[in-house]
Amino acid sequence: MLSNTLRSNFLKFYANRNHTPVASSPVFPHNDPSILFTNAGMNQFKNIFLGKEQTSYTRATTSQKCIRAGGKHNDLENVGHTSRHLTFFEMLGNFSFGDYFKQDAISFAWEVSLSVFNFDPDFIYATVHEKDDEAFALWEKYLPTDRIFRLTDKDNFWSMADTGPCGFCSELLFDRGEKFGKAASPLEDVDGERFLEYWNLVFMEFNRTSDGTLLALQKKCVDTGAGLERLVSLLAETKTVFEADVLRHLISKIENLSGTTYSPTEAKGAAFRVIADHIRSLSFAIADGLLPGNTERGYVLRKILRRAVNYGKRLGFNRPFLADVVPSLVDVMGEAYPELSASVTQIQEVLTTEEEHFFKTLQRGGNLLQQVLKSSASSAKISGEDAFKLKDTYGLPIDEIALLAKDYNYAIDMDTFEKLEVEAKERSRKNTKKTKNDSDSVFQDLDPTNTSEFIGYDTLSCDTFIEGIIKYNEIASSLEEGDEGAIILRTTPFYAEKGGQIGDSGEIFCESGTFLVSHTIAPKAGLIVHLGKLSQGSLTTTMAVTAQVNQNLRKKTANNHTGCHLLHKALEMTLGEHIRQAGSYVDSQKIRLDFTHNKALSPEDLLAIETLVNEKIRENDPVTIREVLYSDVMSSSEIKQFCGDKYGDIVRVVLAGFSHELCGGTHAQATGDIGYFRITKEHAVATGIRRIEATTGEDAENIARGQDVDLNEIATVIQSPKDQILVKIRSVMEEKKDLAKQVADLENQLVQQQVKTLLTSCEKICDTSYLVYYLTEEEGQRIQHYANAIHKEIPTNFISLWITEKNGRYIVLSRVSDDLTKRGVQAHTLLAELLAPYGGRCGGKAISAQGSSAELPQIEFLNKTLRQWISTQLA
């Protein structure tokens, strides 16, 4: 693959010029709410550009996995319908953090263009910002002035988001010749088809704040980005990015699966392009730990998948098919991105599960759409309210609604639909908007030099000094008795909450006062904040104090954290290597671990996992902490790291028996310290995500003892020896089953006898028999039995209406024989019209519906109403 060669040669070029090759970060940013997905190579270096983080290197080069499908950079709707838009792409880049600036950046770019990309220099053009005289002068060394263009902010000022690093940029373009347009220069090339941009050099000089102010960065930096797919297309001289290399390989696989030949100019061509692109976004996102869902990134991922499925239907795919494309993707990209190869099973399982669910949604929504079409027959137009309900409530995409409506020559009230869409998005935005609370703001406003040294790995107590105090969300100089607030220490043994582990609690004290620490947090890098209340006396800044962590709670939390590591490894060994941690929480009482898995764990699975963890506890292996180079971890398959987590050059590895994980938390000294491990609960938390809750030590023993007490009580109640409880319970259950069958048989006999009487009470109109009948409250418990029995006796041309009372409300059941539903008679329509005047509500299908109402008329009136309704329906 040409892309593999280009990627490798690009990285080698910069590595040979003292750039550190840095692995691609995941396709979603870590702790950055300003963007949904990683959309540029510089995302992982944002804090370095801002001067918030330090790194051992000042030059870097990457090939970054990117997704643009949400937020400011959103290409989703264009994919498939243009020659270059993609949701997933690779961004080649080189970066300078206060090292070189414009001169070397431009010099390198020119050399790469000629020696790595093999472009003819006579066809290269450059643009610069209209105010960037320096960049213009530098390009004059390589290009004639008539091939250098000055442009405005719109084209040559770059920013990652509304806030953050930004600066002037310079773009490189390649002239593809007159067959791609008659424009004589980039200024005339409105569509950008002839003079194709292939590289953007961003000169980071500013940090844009939320009010739009441009502040000078502490260090001038360089960020460049060249889209790999676009480069491949240029070198292969294809009209679109889809006709070369990886994407064409995927299209070939889709051709094979669908039995349809790809033609770029035919309408079906868009379907091939959409699927080829979307399978990459989906696969890499899942490999990096994301899953389709109903909110934020998960929602976008689900939207991408459903868009691929909808386009797949145009190629004849009426069953899950995306998983079948994944191996072809791994064949061509798995070597460059090992996480893709390691996650094949997980990717395929998630895709198939989501597709199956969506096909069911389409079927259910399609049935509802048929009802909407029928009710809209007079206007031949689907209302915006109905279209929105089908999409919002039943998950039927508007594209699917439009296609089905087109088949019936129906229009859709898109103005109302779009208005409702906007209103829904606004409600969602208000509900999910994360507002920065006052205390967070205070922490950000603290002096940057006001940092804390953490020494809590080695000690639980130390003498230190108060560096800062916060009271009532404001910076203060003192705390008085009863005040709630926060204290910042120069040195602290308190572990701040992170990595899923709760923060420490304890005391900060001196002769003047005692501060009870309830929780410890790290609101920003280098800052540890102790939250709590002053129980007695007073404390002031600069005061010498003693910091003492609650030893018992720390020990129990550490044991649980090590237990969580053992659980994670046991899950992988029991269920398979597809297991990925999707979240965790550890405190002194419990372990909570979320992991990727598509089905509930059996009792046998849970027992095997619990047994394996306890075996490792009994082996009493020492828990060893090592600090190693992250580059060494990247080359090791034995050490677990977590997608989305950001790591520095030196990382902390926790070795606990068979478990090897990157972790910054506190741990037991040996696995035997954990004592005993017990799973307390296992359940689903989202599609493809399961959760295990567990505990260790004394808490686990208490659970076991409690269950033993329960067994003794059960044995007493059922009058059975303890070792015979299960036998006795099974015997009782069999007896209960037999009795239930006898009761059901008797009830059925009673129903049958009464139905024979009711047959003589049926009336008739328009060749249709009907019955309205009140059941007593006791009879009402068998309301469905009555309806089933009489409709079995009268299988055609029959409508029945059953009424009973329960908890002060009328319960109403309507039934319609199957042959009448084919003539347009609907049970739910009948019941809805019947209950509407009385404020009742109902739900159901064409053949059967049930509802309730606080009021109902006499049976004679209902009988008359039903008779009139049948006459109207079947006239």
UniProtKB/Swiss-Prot annotation:
Q: What catalytic activity is recorded? A: tRNA(Ala) + L-alanine + ATP = L-alanyl-tRNA(Ala) + AMP + diphosphate
| UniProt entry keywords in alphabetical sequence | Aminoacyl-tRNA synthetase, ATP-binding, Cytoplasm, Ligase, Metal-binding, Nucleotide-binding, Protein biosynthesis, RNA-binding, tRNA-binding, Zinc
Tell me a GO biological process for this protein.
alanyl-tRNA aminoacylation
Q: Source gene?
A: alaS
Residues that, per the record, bind Zn(2+) = 561, 565, 663, 667
Which InterPro entries does this chain map to?
aa-tRNA-synth_II/BPL/LPL, Ala-tRNA-lgiase_IIc, Ala-tRNA-ligase_IIc_anticod-bd, Ala-tRNA-synth_IIc_core, Ala-tRNA-synth_IIc_N, Ala-tRNA_ligase, Ala_tRNA_ligase_euk/bac, DHHA1_dom
Which EC numbers does the record give? 6.1.1.7
* Note on how the cofactor is bound: Binds 1 zinc ion per subunit.
Organism of this sequence: Chlamydia trachomatis serovar L2 (strain ATCC VR-902B / DSM 19102 / 434/Bu)
**What's written under domain?**
Consists of three domains; the N-terminal catalytic domain, the editing domain and the C-terminal C-Ala domain. The editing domain removes incorrectly charged amino acids, while the C-Ala domain, along with tRNA(Ala), serves as a bridge to cooperatively bring together the editing and aminoacylation centers thus stimulating deacylation of misacylated tRNAs.
Fetch the Gene3D superfamilies from UniProt: 2.40.30.130, 3.10.310.40, 3.30.54.20, Bira Bifunctional Protein, Domain 2, Threonyl-trna Synthetase, Chain A, domain 2
GO MF, any single term: aminoacyl-tRNA deacylase activity
Question: Is the keyword Zinc in the record?
Answer: yes
- Required cofactor names: Zn(2+)
State the protein's purpose. Catalyzes the attachment of alanine to tRNA(Ala) in a two-step reaction: alanine is first activated by ATP to form Ala-AMP and then transferred to the acceptor end of tRNA(Ala). Also edits incorrectly charged Ser-tRNA(Ala) and Gly-tRNA(Ala) via its editing domain.
Q: Which GO CC annotations does the UniProt entry carry?
A: cytosol
Record family assignment: Belongs to the class-II aminoacyl-tRNA synthetase family.
Q: Where in the cell is it found?
A: Cytoplasm
UniProt keyword ATP-binding present: yes
Q: What is this protein called?
A: Alanine--tRNA ligase
